[in-house]
Amino acid sequence: MFGLGGQELLLILLIILLLFGAKKLPELAKGLGKGMKEFKKAQTEIEDEFNKAMSDPPEKKEKESPSDKG
């Protein structure tokens, strides 16, 4: 995971605990979870739009003839 071992992750968690305190950790985790959910939702929407655009046939544009310009 990001090239981090168990000791590094434990150290990072300890620093976060010291900075924010035990009472703030659930709030931080909840906010992080919501952010990840929003990110995945946006990613899915973009993928769906891309797949739809790739599966739809291209629209043919009619060229204007010189007689149409008037």
From Swiss-Prot:
Coiled-coil annotated residue ranges, if any: none
Record field: compositional bias (Basic and acidic residues): 57-70
Gene Ontology biological process: protein transport by the Tat complex
Organism superkingdom: Bacteria
Residue segments, region Disordered: 47-70
Main location: membrane
UniProt-listed HAMAP family: TatA_E
Name this polypeptide is given: Sec-independent protein translocase protein TatA
